[in-house]
């Protein structure tokens, strides 16, 4: 679902079965299409990461999901993204898929300190960490909740450092 969604958003993707690699041509935080509908199915990782990515964009997108994903938690991530300036229109239940996302635009003025409850999922934090580079070092995340997700968060931060991002103050 993740790669298909990125293709729907207009990204150029090259897959080499032989080399077992996927190459996605980035655009410095920008999304090629300003409007699109994507499907995340039951993929929680794709759902959380893509929602954060779209929320930091300058477009409007609709995210569809499976019935199972509609029941999974998203509220704490969505509240944090609203704190950064994104807006959401819920097409069924509040704080659940399907939804329309209107991004905050690449606007570092809106980047500041946000609060994030990670009791229900560490993916919320990983999603915010991955979009943090758009804030040019101005994003500070204060964690609430007691979920022990250190290994996943460290994996996210290590991956980001491989791409040259110094990290986020938490």
Model-derived segments and spans:
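Structural preference for solvent-exposed beta-strand-turn elements
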Residues: 1-170
